[in-house]
Structures are given as structure tokens and as C-alpha cells.
Amino acid sequence: MMNDGKQQSTFLFHDYETFGTHPALDRPAQFAAIRTDSEFNVIGEPEVFYCKPADDYLPQPGAVLITGITPQEARAKGENEAAFAARIHSLFTVPKTCILGYNNVRFDDEVTRNIFYRNFYDPYAWSWQHDNSRWDLLDVMRACYALRPEGINWPENDDGLPSFRLEHLTKANGIEHSNAHDAMADVYATIAMAKLVKTRQPRLFDYLFTHRNKHKLMALIDVPQMKPLVHVSGMFGAWRGNTSWVAPLAWHPENRNAVIMVDLAGDISPLLELDSDTLRERLYTAKTDLGDNAAVPVKLVHINKCPVLAQANTLRPEDADRLGINRQHCLDNLKILRENPQVREKVVAIFAEAEPFTPSDNVDAQLYNGFFSDADRAAMKIVLETEPRNLPALDITFVDKRIEKLLFNYRARNFPGTLDYAEQQRWLEHRRQVFTPEFLQGYADELQMLVQQYADDKEKVALLKALWQYAEEIV
């Protein structure tokens, strides 16, 4: 990988298969990654490995039906999560690596952060330290469809809307992807999509790659002038190609990586007519519960999450027509907003109060409760450098209340042999609180229902039976 004595930049394409959809409360099953050079030529060996589930967790049946990976298979082929985390960490922290996948910003990266959090690695540094970065090809595909669709076949789903599912895109473009939802197959498919866009739409590809960087994005955002931009985001919905013209009203009052945008294609009357309390309530009301009320056409754009933003004229008139975006309506709304600067204060007030949030007392769900201090981070590094068998004798104090609980869970899940009698009892009590009679009854009912639903599908029934056996074995 050396090149003129300097480390070359590489892409690390990766994908997780997990035992459920919740990045903090569910667990990883399999990880796959391939490193490529800047032209997407494979460097080194493909990496695939499994994670052994700990004994305080049962997989979501629906996830196992999708991936086909049973907890028994993960246990037989896998290593404990501490070792699993260490391998991923060493891949992700090679300098000048751009870590990417398909829908990773919203899913896989959250899985990574939570794995690192549970296993005493910095949850964030991998994506920025040592010239590293992250990127996500899902929004690249969405942007390509909306802004420069030529040269690529765009499949539709059953509703006649564009589909950005990896297996649909690969099929429509004649790319081999026989084993969807196998992590390695998905990684190869993602590399193939990257090559396709780079070949067919090189200027768009290079623009989006450069603008994965938050400092580059910041340069596009002009709040005082409310300068309009084109924004591509899954939040807008496939019915309009996930695209709209937006205008920046203000920076978020607390999160310096978030800018408050108005969707210019929306109905802006609520912003003019309602006060900030009413707007906040409506913003956090599900669309289905709004009734006749107009939605609040405001969204946060997080510049550290690789959002797609570009100059307004990047969306050509013919593409706006194809996507059903009314340019004149957007221009009219922009004019009204510029004439009503008081709207800025209202939207800042909406976000000045935190989003309704129920704190969890489960330490696994507390990644976002705050950053760790330097002293605690140094102490966590010592935990990693200590032989597991010496962890019980480790005499360090932590300031953050989470760390003692994390350390206990880390030992109990990965190195149960290091627990003394009192600690074994504490872990047993923890497992009793997880596997309550109500939880187990609900789990059994779900398996039963799925067995009936898939009675004719031998493979699925076998997976469900394996889950039943696994539950009986560990509970």
C-alpha cells in the first residue's frame, strides 16, 4: 500500500449483517470489508468475520429470516465482541481511509459507534483522525437519479417509484449480486455501483466525493442571504426523487453541525402564521396524525453526515419537471421568506428546546448521553491494554457513571471467567431482568406466528426452529 514512500488514500467498503434493526440494543452477526485504491481496484484480502452473541441477548426473528445467519452459526464461526471490535477498529484506523457503504451513515456507522462504545474504543475518531473520512453511496445513487440520471438504468418498485435498494439497482444494471444480504455480496455490489457512477457521471461523482467533507459543505451555506440550494435526502420521499430546493434559515442553536433548512417546495404558511411552540408540536407529530394540518416544511441538515447539497442550478429545469418540483412555487416561497426575517427567530426557538427524548437507564443505549472526558478516555485505553484475566485487579476510578457499568458488561459478555461469585450473581440478575416471563412469552408468540406465516418455506421454518432451540439453551 506504500506509494512514493507516502501512505496512499484508500476506500474501505463495508457492510454489517445484524441480529436486529436497533444499532444500540441489537447485536452484530457478521462484518465484511474490502479495501480498494482510488480507482476501486481491490487491494489486499477481503475480510469477513462473525461475532459471537453474548448470553444476555436474543436475536430479532425478522432479522434472522433476512440474513439467514443463526446465532448458532455466529457462535460457531465467530469471536467475542471484544475481539470482533478490535479487528474492525484496526481496519478503520488505517490512515487516509474513506470508510463507506450503502446506507451506512444511518445504519452501519451507528452500529460501529455502538460496538466501539461497548468495547472501550473511541466511537467517533475512526471517521476523522489521520485524514480519515466517511461517505455513503446510497445518497450518491439518489443524487445521480435526481440530478444526472443519464447512462444508468433506474429500476422501479411495485408502486412505480424509483427503487434504491441495492439488489434492484445491481439487477437493472446487469451487475452480479446473487446473494443479497450476505455481507460480502453486498460489499462487492456497492463497489460495482461506485464504479458505475464514476464511469457514467464522473463530474457528479467527484463533486459528491469532495463535498462529503463538512468544511466544503459549509462554504455552500449562506444563512444571511438565505441562498437556495438543491438538497437530496431520503426524508423527501421517492415520489419526488428525494429532492427539493431548500434555503438555510439559521444554524442550530446547540448543534454546530446542523443547519435549519426550509423545504421551498412545501407549504410555508405554518411558518408565517404559527408561533414556535405550535410549530414545534406539529414538527414532532407523525405525518399520519396531522389530519388537515399542513406539515412544517423544515428539516435539519447535518453537515457531518455527508448530506447532498449543491448550487441551486445543479437541478436542471427538465429534471425538476421530471421529478414534479415546481420551480416557480419554490422561488415565490423564497421571496416571502426573505421578506419575513422574523421566521428565523421562530425556527431557532423550535430547536432551542431539545427534541422530546426519553432517557434510558440501560447503559447500552447511552452512547449519546455525552462525550467522555480526556481522563476517562485515558482510563478506557488502560482497560483495552490490560490482559482480560487482570481486569478484576484493575484499580482505576472513572468520573463518568457509564463506564463502571460498561466495564462490568464488557467482562461478563466477553470474559465471563473473570467474574467472581458476587459478580456472577449480579450478571444472573441482569439476565433475569432482560429475560422476563413477559419478554419470553412475547418471543415465543412471535416465533409461533412466523412459523405459521412461513409454513410452506422449509428454509425459514428451519431458521425459526434454530432460534427456538437457541432461546431454550441460553435462557
Curated annotation (Swiss-Prot):
Degrades single-stranded DNA (ssDNA) in a highly processive manner. Also functions as a DNA deoxyribophosphodiesterase that releases deoxyribose-phosphate moieties following the cleavage of DNA at an apurinic/apyrimidinic (AP) site by either an AP endonuclease or AP lyase. The keyword Metal-binding applies. Monomer. Interacts with ssb (via C-terminus); this interaction stimulates the exonuclease activity by recruiting the enzyme to its substrate. The record marks R148, Y207, Q311, R338 as: Important for interaction with ssb. Residues 13-192 form the Exonuclease domain. This is Exodeoxyribonuclease I. Mg(2+) 1 binds at D15. Its cofactor is Mg(2+). The record marks H181 as: Important for activity. The N-terminal exonuclease domain and the exonuclease C-terminal domain form a central positively charged groove which binds the DNA. It is an enzyme of class 3 (hydrolase). Residues 358-475 form the ExoI C-terminal domain. Changing Y207A: Strongly reduced ssb-binding. Reduced ssb-dependent nuclease activity. Its EC number is 3.1.11.1. It comes from Escherichia coli (strain K12). Changing R316A: Strongly reduced ssb-binding. Strongly reduced ssb-dependent nuclease activity. The record marks T18, I66, R113, Y124, W128, R142, F164, K214, N257, Y284, N304, Y368, F371 as: Interaction with single-stranded DNA.
